[in-house]
Amino acid sequence: MHAVRYSQAFIPTLKEAPADAQVASHKLLVRAGFIRQLGAGIYDYLPLAKRSLAKVEAIVREEMDAIGGQEFYLPALHPAEIWKESGRWDVMGDNMFRLKDRKGGDYCLGMTHEEIFTAVARDELRSYRQLPQVWYQIQTKFRDEPRPKSGLLRVRQFTMKDAYSFDVDRAGLDRSYEDQRRAYEKIFTRCGLDFVAVQAHSGSMGGSESSEFMVRTEAGEDLVAACPRCRYAANTETATSRVAAEADGPGLGAPEKFATPGVVTIEALEQAPHSVPARRQLKTLVYMADEKPVIAVVRGDQELNEAKLQTATGAVAVRPAHPEEIPPLMGARAGSLGAVRFTRARVLVDPSLADRKDMVTGANEDGFHLRGVDVRRDVLAHGATLAELRTVKAGEGCPRCDGTLDVFKALEIGHIFKLGTKYSESMKATVLDAEGKQVPIVMGSYGIGVERILAAAIELHHDDNGIVFPMAIAPFHATVLTLGPEPELRKAAEEVVAALGKEGVEVLFDDRDERAGVKFKDADLLGIPIRIAVGKKGLAAGNVEWKLRKGGAVELVPVGEVARKAAEAVRAAT
C-alpha cells in the first residue's frame, strides 16, 4: 500500500482556530487542515477530510449492501412539478433552494429525494413480486439554512446517504425498518460513535413513526429525554413524562374576574399583590396552524413544544400569531389571554391540566384575569380537546417506569421514517398485490449525514492536543516519523513504512525536515491512531517507539515486529 509523504502532502495546519469557531469539531477540522470555508455554510473538503469521508461512505455502503440495498445516483436538480405532486413544493418554504431555467421553468436543488425515488418506483415497479426493494444513494443535498454555524454541523451543502424501502404491506415495512435500524447501529458502532436511538418527530417527512440516532454532546442542538432505568429515550419534540399531581383546593363555583393592571407575564402574576405560583397559572398561547388560529394551553411554568403542536393539529406548518392577529380573535392582547368558554378557534389543552382546579388565567380583557378556573368545567366542557403540548423537563417521571428522566443535548447523525403510503398515494405509485388489486407501495425513508458522522466522532474523541480518531475513519492508520536528520534513521523509517504498506496499513510518512517536537504536535493534532518514531537510541537496540493516540504510553517495539503489531491493531479496531 502506497504511503503518503508529509513533505508532498497538502496539510495546511493552523496554530489557532478561527475566531468564529465555537464547537470542537469546527475548530479542529480547520486547524488540522481538513476543511476551509468558502461561504456561509459552504466548505471545501481538503485531502485529509476526503480520506476520512471516503471511509465513512465505505462503511455505509457495506452495511447498506448487507441488507440488500442497491446503490443509485439520482439528480440533485429537480423540476418543481414532481415536488408539487407530493404537495411539498410549498411546504419546504425558504429552506429549499429554488431557481428558474432560461425558459422560466421552476426547479429546486434537492434537500431529500423521496419524490424522485417514488417517481422511479412508480414508473418501473408493477407487481408485488418485485418487492421488497431497498434503494439508496450517497449524494449531495442542499438546504438554505438560515443560520449556518458550528462547522459541518449546520451547513447549506452536505452529503447524505438516503435510502428508501418499497414493500407491498405494513408488515413488510416493519421488517425493512428494523433492517435499517440494525444496519444503522452497525454503521455508527464501526465509526466509533456512542449513540442512542430515540423516538422522534417526523416533521415535513410525514409518516407514522420515526427514530433518530443521537450522539450525546454539548455541541448538539437537539434535546433528548432519557430514562437510565428502562432506557426509554425520545427527542423532546415527542417525549412524554409523568408529572406529579398538584393538590388543588375545591376552587370556586364559577371563575371570578379580578383586576391585574400592567400584569402581562407569568412572572409578574407571581409577584405581590397577586402572588399566584406559575404552576397554578394557565399559559394561553395563540398560534397559526396552516394559517388557521389555534389556542394552546399549558401550565404557567411549562413550555409549549411547537413540534408537538404541529403533530396535534396535523398542520404542515405552525407559527406564533403576530401581535396584531391576536386582539381581533381574543378580544385582548397577549398577557391577558385565556381559553375559558372560548369557542372562536380550536383549543388544545395539555393533558397534565385535565383535572386542575382553582387555576388562574387571562380574562380576554386587557388588565384582567380569572381565578377559580376548573379546567374540565370551564375549558374542556366547551369544546377544547386534550393534546400533548408541553416540553418535558429533567427530573420528571419516566412514562414507562418509576424512573426519572434525564434531559441532555444531542447531535442527530441519522433518522429513519416509516412513510407508509404518504408519497405513493399522492404520486400514484402502485403495484398489483397477490390478489390482483392495485395497492399503493408502502415506503420507508432512511437518512445519514456523512459529514455529521465525521464531526460527531471528533466531538466525542478529542483532547487538548487535537483529534483522537477512531481507527475506522482516521485519514491514516499510522504515522511514521524520525527523531533526527541522520540518514540511517531515514533509511530505517523507509523500511518500516514499506513493511507497514505490505501489511495493508495506511501510513502518513512524516519525512519533513522539522524538529521531533513539531512532528509530535502535528501527529496529535491530526489524530492519527498509531505513532511510530524512529530514533538513534532505540534503533541501536533494534527498536522503534510505538504510541497510540488514544492515551497510550510509549512502548519500544522491535523493528521487525512493528508492522505486524500495527496490522493487528488496525484489524482489531476496524
Curated annotation (Swiss-Prot):
PROSITE patterns: AA_TRNA_LIGASE_II (PS50862)
Signal peptide positions on this chain: none
GO molecular function: aminoacyl-tRNA deacylase activity; ATP binding; proline-tRNA ligase activity
Cell location: Cytoplasm
Source domain of life: Bacteria
Keywords: Aminoacyl-tRNA synthetase, ATP-binding, Cytoplasm, Ligase, Nucleotide-binding, Protein biosynthesis
Reaction equation(s) it catalyzes: tRNA(Pro) + L-proline + ATP = L-prolyl-tRNA(Pro) + AMP + diphosphate
Keyword set includes Transferase: no
InterPro entries: aa-tRNA-synt_IIb, aa-tRNA-synth_II, aa-tRNA-synth_II/BPL/LPL, Anticodon-bd, Anticodon-bd_dom_sf, Pro-tRNA-ligase_IIa, Pro-tRNA-synth_IIa_bac-type, Pro-tRNA-Synthase_IIa_type1
EC number, UniProt record: 6.1.1.15
Matches recorded under NCBIfam families: PRK09194.1, proS_fam_II
Family as reported in the entry's similarity comment: Belongs to the class-II aminoacyl-tRNA synthetase family. ProS type 1 subfamily.
Function according to Swiss-Prot or TrEMBL: Catalyzes the attachment of proline to tRNA(Pro) in a two-step reaction: proline is first activated by ATP to form Pro-AMP and then transferred to the acceptor end of tRNA(Pro). As ProRS can inadvertently accommodate and process non-cognate amino acids such as alanine and cysteine, to avoid such errors it has two additional distinct editing activities against alanine. One activity is designated as 'pretransfer' editing and involves the tRNA(Pro)-independent hydrolysis of activated Ala-AMP.
PANTHER family assigned to the protein according to its UniProt record, in alphabetical order: MITOCHONDRIAL RIBOSOME PROTEIN L39/PROLYL-TRNA LIGASE FAMILY MEMBER, PROLINE--TRNA LIGASE
Summary of subunit composition and partner proteins: Homodimer.
Protein's recorded name: Proline--tRNA ligase
Protein source organism: Anaeromyxobacter sp. (strain K)
Lineage: Bacteria, Pseudomonadati, Myxococcota, Myxococcia, Myxococcales
